[in-house]
Amino acid sequence: MSHPASLASRLHALALNDTLFPDLHQLEKAQRTRTIYRIFHTVASTAALGQEDIVDDLAPLFTLMESPCLTRQGGLCPLLASHYNLYLGTLLELGDRHHPEIIGQIEEALALRTHGLYLVTELGCGNNAMSMATEVRYDCATDGFILHTPHRHAAKFMPYIALEGQPKSSVVMARLWVGEQDCGIHPFLVPCRDARGALCQGVSVSSPDVLDLPYRGGSRHHHLRAGNTPPLGMAQGS
């Protein structure tokens, strides 16, 4: 567990390091993106948050999110919030801590070997979760789940997934279907970039045509077999 006062002191010292925070306006788009991720990794490594800092004593997480490092580089805020609060927070609060895949993804994210994403917003409905069109169908033959984006308006927009070479995993909000029964919106654990940073099979990414969003874009899932990990918060067999 990180002591908040000690953590605040370390992060304050880090924020004074001008070498860590270059002027991004002097860099090309790809360089800006990779620089932000380098800063993210340095700041997150300095914080070294554990499970208890995210779901039990939240003071270290709040200390991180209130750090002056975020005023030096505003792009840190969504990356840190997505990784710790949304992705890891969901896995730790709702995930089955005895399931080997969930255990593995938590360990990878805490060690910063993968970056966590949270895919909710859709191109056609924004954050209106009840209108969400991304679907997961239960496959009784394999006791697994198949994730699919049925049309372009259901593309998740705009997750931090477009940058190549970055291992990433995600919590995807999708509508669960069991046969013809609509079982509502549930979160699913879905890796989207492998250890080499390549897109996983069944995942595609499109870059926005107009907006200058260097590492964001629309993501789709094409009949992606999401394994037999049950919806987060739902016990296997329930």
Which positions does each model-derived feature cover?
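Flexible, small-/acidic-enriched active-site or ligand-binding loops
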Residues: 199-225
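Sensory/regulatory domains in signal-transduction proteins
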Residues: 120-128, 153-156
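A short core secondary-structure module
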Residues: 140-204, 219
